């Protein structure tokens, strides 16, 4: 499998590296880094002061060179009536997106003794692996430690591992 990472907007080298490393370690796949892209026209919703996640998925699918493609952006994303999303993917689709905007809170609430930088890096890895998992046909998992567990808050992201549980692993690999 080949996953193409599509940076959209200003994405740091650290975020690109963490995303790439996370995908390689969990899915043992080939990962490439696409040329940076501009924010998609029409993605911004002025009433919400946020960006439509679907527009980033469409961009990743359109310009990405992989069988699976994931956009990464620092912009604050939303989907339909949800206040925000960390990421979005369509089950079995070729495009997905994560936003680092809400992953950058300074601490994990005392869950671990890691630095803010380490916590952020782990969140990026988890969300990239989670969204690409959806494109591979994985649905949300009830196992709170599994990377495919639904995590609407950063606290819940922090609880899960950067790996698939046995059940999800059997379903995808």
Swiss-Prot record:
Zn(2+) 1 binds at residues 130, 134, 140. The active site is at 131 (proton acceptor). GO terms for biological process: proteolysis. It comes from the Archaea. Keywords: Hydrolase, Metal-binding, Metalloprotease, Protease, Zinc. Belongs to the peptidase M54 family. This is Archaemetzincin. It comes from Haloarcula marismortui (strain ATCC 43049 / DSM 3752 / JCM 8966 / VKM B-1809) (Halobacterium marismortui). The gene is amzA.
């Amino acid at each position: 499998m080949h996953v193409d990472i599509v940076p959209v907007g200003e994405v740091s080298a650290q975020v690109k590296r963490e995303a790439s490393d996370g995908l390689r370690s969990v899915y043992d796949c080939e990962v490439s880094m696409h040329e940076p892209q501009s924010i998609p026209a029409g993605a911004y919703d002025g009433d919400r002061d946020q960006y439509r996640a679907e527009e980033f998925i469409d961009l990743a699918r359109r310009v990405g060179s992989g069988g699976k493609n994931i956009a990464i952006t620092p912009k604050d994303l939303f989907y339909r009536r949800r206040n925000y999303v960390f990421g979005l993917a369509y089950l079995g689709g070729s495009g997905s997106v994560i936003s680092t905007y809400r992953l950058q809170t300074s601490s994990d609430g005392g869950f671990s003794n890691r630095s803010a930088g380490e916590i952020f890096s782990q969140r990026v890895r988890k969300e990239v692996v989670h969204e690409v998992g959806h494109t591979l046909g994985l649905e949300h998992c009830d196992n709170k430690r599994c990377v495919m567990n639904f995590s609407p808050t950063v606290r819940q992201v922090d609880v899960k591992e950067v790996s698939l549980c046995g059940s999800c692993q059997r379903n995808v690999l």
